[in-house]
Amino acid sequence: MSLSIDVTSLPSISSSIFKNESSSTTSTLSGKSIGRNEQYVSSDIEAFNKYMLSKSPEDIGPSDSASNNPLTSFSIRSNAVKTNADAGVSMDSSTQSRPSSNVGCDQMDFSLTKGINVSASLDSCVSISTNHKKEKSKKDKSRKHYPRIEADSDYEDYVLDDSDSDDGKCKNCKYKKKYFALRMRMKQVAMQLIEDL
């Protein structure tokens, strides 16, 4: 974006300084000038008191106490340049007042370079891995695993005793031999403990 201002078509500059007395000076730039009315007011304690008393407490804000000194704030604002609105600068300069060539034409160029480079690349990767365990069959669930107990008999030739077993319930049982062997061994261990005591 480029903005060009041709100062040859601007009005004349006139500045008036007021401090109990006024004087007028005029300066010319490229045949034309800018008009502005400036007024400076010296800080006055009475003017400050009138200013503060004329405002309600609700209207007094941080801008009234610059540098934590209200008198300094009042002096800063009262000494500020006051521009006359009637002597404003018009940016709509007529093309008839411009010369046919750029000779004698002062130009001010304001160049604004604004570059916006936005790179919005979003890489997203979602990986979901699920491992399903094989479901055991109903047979495996209903089946209970007991620890295996093995017992060896001290006697190679021993006779199974059916005297304390229920009639007809433990015939041809494959665990009967191991049961009696384990029972005999437990009896021997118990007898040995009694003897040791």
UniProtKB/Swiss-Prot annotation:
Its cofactor is Mg(2+). It comes from the Viruses. Pfam families: Rota_NS26 (PF01525). The keyword Lipid metabolism does not apply. Residues 17-30 have a biased composition (Low complexity). It is found in: Host cytoplasm. O-glycosylated. Homodimer. Interacts with VP1. Interacts with VP2. Interacts with NSP2; this interaction leads to up-regulation of NSP5 hyperphosphorylation and formation of virus factories. Interacts with NSP6. Participates in the selective exclusion of host proteins from stress granules (SG) and P bodies (PB). Also participates in the sequestration of these remodeled organelles in viral factories. Belongs to the rotavirus NSP5 family. Its main location: host cell. Residues 17-36 are annotated as: Disordered. GO terms for cellular component: host cell cytoplasm. HAMAP family: ROTA_NSP5. Plays an essential role in the viral genome replication. Participates, together with NSP2, in the formation of viral factories (viroplasms), which are large inclusions in the host cytoplasm where replication intermediates are assembled and viral RNA replication takes place. Orchestrates the recruitment of viroplasmic proteins such as capsid proteins to these factories. Participates in the selective exclusion of host proteins from stress granules (SG) and P bodies (PB). Also participates in the sequestration of these remodeled organelles in viral factories. InterPro entries: Rotavirus_A/C_NSP5. Keywords: Glycoprotein, Host cytoplasm, Magnesium, Metal-binding, Nucleotide-binding, RNA-binding. The keyword Transcription does not apply. One of its GO terms (molecular function) is magnesium ion binding. This is Non-structural protein 5.
